[in-house]
Structure formats: structure tokens, C-alpha cells
């Protein structure tokens, strides 16, 4: 009797380009794809949408959220026009500039990232337009509603099970990345697992 081949795991990953913790987790999931047979799908969420009805935000963070609309609007416009396959290279280009290179001039980041991803320059106009906001909200809620109201990003759906995290301060590489994925799949497969957490003691490191 032939044994059935193991079913490929699917990781649906919701990102906002501005979040440094999400950036690290996204680089981890791409490392996992090198050592495990998984399908990775990127989707757009929005920190600005997540926080738009909160009155307790510090003024500096509130200003940051006002700027956060631009990159996600461009990302969702690119997806709408060219398909979900463009999100990985576009996010990678944005994240490298924002986090690895420390470039926070978002207009410049958007323009250069579109070029890197081979996408039309005119998509940059979406950054200051609300034309794609309904699509952005739909994508955001598809990822975030399933995981709950009191979390942000990184949010991953592992084989359809949604959770916040893992939150990592460094990018696991090779088999180390694979082992962390194996543990994540194990947690996700148990329907009564909800949370495992400790206080962060170091900043994100992008190398």
C-alpha cells in the first residue's frame, strides 16, 4: 500500500513594510521555504488601519501612523494591478531600504522599490490616494480578524490557523529556521493553543 505524500504546509503572511519585527519574521519565513516544503503567500495589512480608532497613542506614534498609509496603499495597488506575486519582491525592496539601509524617506523608498520590483512608476501615486483603501481594508481584515483585536503584525496563518508572531529579534537561518517552523506548525495544529510570550529584551537585528 502506497503511503500518501505529506501535505504541503501553507503560510499566509500579513505585513506592513514599516514594522521592524514583521520584517525579521518575513525574512525567517523565506528562510523556511529553503529548507521545508511550504508555500508562502504574502498579504498586506495596515498598522494605520489597526490603530486608526485608538485615542491613547503617543503623538510621535500617531504621526508615524499618518505616514504609514503610503507604502501599504502602493503595495495593495500593485497587487490589484499585477497580482499577489508582486508583493514578495516589492515588500523585500521596501523592507531592505527602510530597515537594513535605514531610509525613512518613504516617497523615495516607494519610488526606488517599485523600480527594483519591475513595477510601473505611476503606482507611486497610490500613496496619497484613497482609491485602493477598500481593497486595503479587505486584505487587512482577512488577516487580522481571525487573530483577534489585541495584536498587530507579524500575523501568520499556518495551514489556515491564525496567530500573532513569532516575534524574533534575529533572523534564523538554515535548519534553525526550519526547526522553528516545525514548532510553529505543531502549535498551530492544536486547536486549544493561544499564547506563549515573554518580554522582549533586545532590539531587532536585521543582519
Swiss-Prot record:
UniProt entry keywords in alphabetical sequence: Cytoplasm, Oxidoreductase
| Main location, first listed in the record | cytoplasm
Query: Does the keyword field hold Acyltransferase?
Result: no
SUPFAM superfamilies, A to Z:
Thioredoxin-like (SSF52833)
Answer yes or no on keyword Oxidoreductase: yes
> Where does the UniProt annotation locate this protein?
Cytoplasm
Q: How does it assemble?
A: Homodimer.
The name this protein carries in UniProt is Thioredoxin-like reductase Rv2466c
Amino acid at each position: 500500500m502506497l503511503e500518501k505524500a505529506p501535505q504541503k504546509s501553507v503560510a499566509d503572511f500579513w505585513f506592513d513594510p514599516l514594522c521592524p519585527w514583521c520584517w525579521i519574521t518575513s525574512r525567517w519565513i523565506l528562510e523556511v521555504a529553503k529548507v521545508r516544503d511550504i508555500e508562502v503567500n504574502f498579504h498586506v495589512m495596515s498598522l494605520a488601519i489597526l490603530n486608526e480608532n485608538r485615542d491613547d497613542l503617543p503623538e510621535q506614534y500617531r504621526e508615524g501612523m499618518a505616514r504609514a498609509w503610503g507604502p501599504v496603499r502602493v503595495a495593495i495597488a500593485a497587487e490589484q494591478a499585477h497580482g499577489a506575486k508582486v508583493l514578495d519582491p516589492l515588500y523585500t525592496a521596501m523592507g531592505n531600504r527602510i530597515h537594513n539601509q535605514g531610509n525613512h524617506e518613504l516617497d523615495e523608498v516607494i519610488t526606488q522599490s517599485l523600480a527594483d520590483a519591475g513595477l510601473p512608476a505611476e503606482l507611486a501615486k497610490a500613496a496619497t490616494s484613497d482609491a485602493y483603501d477598500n481593497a486595503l481594508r479587505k486584505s487587512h481584515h482577512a488577516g487580522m480578524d481571525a487573530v483577534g483585536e489585541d495584536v498587530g503584525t507579524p500575523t501568520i496563518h499556518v495551514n489556515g490557523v491564525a496567530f500573532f508572531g513569532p516575534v524574533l529579534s534575529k533572523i534564523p537561518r538554515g535548519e534553525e529556521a526550519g526547526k522553528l517552523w516545525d514548532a510553529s506548525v505543531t502549535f498551530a495544529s492544536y486547536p486549544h493553543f493561544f499564547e506563549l510570550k515573554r518580554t522582549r529584551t533586545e532590539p531587532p537585528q536585521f543582519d
